[in-house]
């Protein structure tokens, strides 16, 4: 009876041992060098005939509890930190030889500890054995080498193909977003940029495509006339804002420009290069055209009275700039004044300028947003507000001595500030000013 019990216990223990070996082998199949950082290469020699399961079982069995729970091989395999252990066995003259490969995603120190632990194994199955670590390979170095070689091959195949640069891709996305910013303005639902409702200056173009092109290049204060008949919204805006007419460089653009100059209060005129349309201009061409804008009064006079084209006017202006070179000052002899002769100097004509407010004028000019400054008599800033909130700010603050803002001085604004006792009103431009109180000095930046 005792013998039977001993045989059964032996069979059960052997069964458990085989199951452990199988479990270790199946766990080893979870990782196939996918996230491996290092590979431990080892060689073994056993004084007898052994098989692969014997070697795997020895590795798991004899290192169990040796390095603590954190570096236990079974736990490391369950969490994927140790990969599938590969073993090759060869038998010769009653002895077994082979190699062991252990993939590791641990760090260098922990991998070295695991490698050293393998060398403590002294038995494989029933036989004495010896394991020696040959090397630890850094898989990432091999991957880097592969990446370099493969990248060279890919580059050779793509070298002749046009690959968009990152900047081009970014610009494409920006353009798509800007196109979504298009709004409809006024009763006529004119295509316009998002800044048209509150911007002090606007650009009037011919059609929707022109507004879209300007939007793509970051210009958000454009509005289209949409046809040869100028809408009432454009006429009304021209009386309240600083308006630049920006038309195509063809016959149609010239006709629309003439109509705009006749029915609207245009301040500046810009044209696309001859033969080109605004909708097809590049950013560089748009900026160059807008920088070369000509005052509307000059264009009106030359266009209607002298019959010159816009481009002739621009060429003449450029020619005048080249001719106006600084000449050397010729020293003229000073007139001799007799002892009894009186020197009569002309009395200076008083100019209405913004002396004493230069610092504040530059401040509003250089601001990214249109702002207004409210000053007291000692030139201290009482309030700094957006130009659209100027009227309410004047109404809410007492003791305002001067108002300086980057916007258009209108009759309504003059009436409001004069009622509050303001002495100085300084702005970018005047528009339709009919009456001006004696106590109020109205000054533009140009003055």
From Swiss-Prot:
Residues 200-274 form the Toprim domain. The gene is dnaG. GO terms for cellular component: cytoplasm; DNA-directed RNA polymerase complex; exosome (RNase complex); primosome complex. Its cofactor is Mg(2+). Mg(2+) 1 binds at residues 206, 248. PROSITE patterns: TOPRIM (PS50880). It comes from Pyrococcus abyssi (strain GE5 / Orsay). NCBIfam families: PRK04031.1-1. This is DNA primase DnaG. One of its GO terms (biological process) is DNA replication, synthesis of primer. Keywords: DNA replication, DNA-directed RNA polymerase, Exosome, Magnesium, Metal-binding, Nucleotidyltransferase, Primosome, Transcription, Transferase. GO terms for molecular function: DNA-directed RNA polymerase activity; metal ion binding; poly(A) binding. RNA polymerase that catalyzes the synthesis of short RNA molecules used as primers for DNA polymerase during DNA replication. Also part of the exosome, which is a complex involved in RNA degradation. Acts as a poly(A)-binding protein that enhances the interaction between heteromeric, adenine-rich transcripts and the exosome. It comes from the Archaea. The keyword Cell division does not apply.
